[in-house]
C-alpha cells in the first residue's frame, strides 16, 4: 500500500464513491455523509426514488451525482455500473456496498426461496459488484472497498439463520479480497453493525423482542444509520490507509460478551 502521512483530516472530498442501497436506510445515510464531505456520488438502488435523492444531494451540497437504478443480482450489472461511472467521472475511488435484505424465521420454518434470496442479495450480489469494481481499481492503481455486514455474521442470533450465513459469507469474501488485492493498493474492509434503526429493521425488531435485544447490548440501545455512515466514511478515507481486511464492529459492545 502507498504511504501518505496523516494530515489531521478525515476527508473524501472529490473522491468518486459508489454507494449501493442509496435510496434508504444505511445507504441513504452514507450518501448524505459523503455528500457533506464533498465526494462525487454514484447512487445505486432498485428503487427509482434514488434519482430524486441524487438530485436533492446535488442541489443541497453542490456535488456531482449519478443515480443508477438497477438490479445488483444480475451478473451484467457490475460492469454496467463501472462503465457508466468511468464515462462520467473517469475513476472509482470508493465502493460502499450497503444494499441487503433481512428475511427472518426459525430454521425449521425457513423456505428454500427465503434462503436463496438472502444469499443472492447479501453475498453473491456484493461479490459480483466487488469483482467488477476490483478489476477496474487494479488497473487504476488502487481504491477503497467497504461492505456492510452485521454482528449477525460474527455471533448467532435466533430466527436469523439465512441472514447470519449470508453475512458470514460476506465477511469471509471481503477478507479474502483484502488478502488478494492489498498488493494493488486496494483496501477491503467491513462495518458490522448491531441492530440499526432503519425501516427494514424496525419491522423485524418490535415489542418485547426489541426490549430483550437492547438488554443484551452493553450500550443499551440500537444504532442509528448515520453512526454506520461515519464508520464507512472513515474506512473510505486516507486515514484508514493501513487498515485492510478489518471487520469494524459498531455494535455497542454486543459481541464482546
Regions found by a protein language model. Give the residues of each.
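Substrate-binding pocket helix/loop in short-chain dehydrogenase/reductase
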Residues: 106-107, 111-116, 201, 213
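Active-site loop immediately N-terminal to the catalytic Tyr-X3-Lys motif
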Residues: 108, 155-161, 183-184, 220, ...
Amino acid at each position: 500500500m502507498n504511504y501518505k502521512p496523516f494530515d489531521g483530516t478525515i476527508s473524501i472530498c472529490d473522491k468518486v464513491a459508489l454507494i449501493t442501497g442509496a435510496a434508504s436506510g444505511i445507504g441513504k445515510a452514507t450518501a448524505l455523509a459523503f455528500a457533506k464531505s464533498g465526494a462525487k456520488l454514484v447512487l445505486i438502488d432498485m428503487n427509482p426514488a434514488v434519482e430524486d435523492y441524487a438530485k436533492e444531494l446535488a442541489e443541497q451540497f453542490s456535488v456531482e451525482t449519478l443515480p443508477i437504478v438497477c438490479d445488483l443480482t444480475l451478473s451484467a450489472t457490475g460492469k454496467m455500473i463501472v462503465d457508466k461511472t468511468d464515462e462520467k467521472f473517469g475513476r472509482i475511488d470508493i465502493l460502499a456496498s450497503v444494499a441487503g435484505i433481512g428475511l427472518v424465521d426459525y430454521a425449521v420454518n425457513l423456505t428454500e426461496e427465503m434462503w436463496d434470496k438472502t444469499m443472492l442479495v447479501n453475498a453473491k450480489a456484493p461479490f459480483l459488484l466487488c469483482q467488477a469494481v476490483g478489476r477496474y481499481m487494479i488497473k487504476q492503481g488502487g481504491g477503497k472497498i467497504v461492505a456492510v455486514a452485521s454482528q449477525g455474521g460474527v455471533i448467532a442470533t435466533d430466527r436469523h439463520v439465512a441472514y447470519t450465513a449470508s453475512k458470514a459469507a460476506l465477511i469471509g469474501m471481503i477478507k479474502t479480497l483484502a488478502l488478494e488485492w492489498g498488493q494493488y493498493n486496494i483496501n477491503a474492509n467491513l462495518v458490522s453493525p448491531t441492530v440499526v434503526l432503519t425501516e427494514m429493521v424496525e419491522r423485524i425488531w418490535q415489542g418485547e423482542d426489541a426490549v430483550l435485544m437492547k438488554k443484551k447490548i452493553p450500550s443499551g440501545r440500537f444504532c442509528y444509520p448515520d453512526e454506520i455512515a461515519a464508520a464507512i466514511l472513515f474506512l473510505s478515507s486516507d486515514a484508514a490507509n493501513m487498515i485492510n481486511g478489518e471487520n469494524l464492529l459498531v455494535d455497542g459492545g454486543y459481541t464482546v460478551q
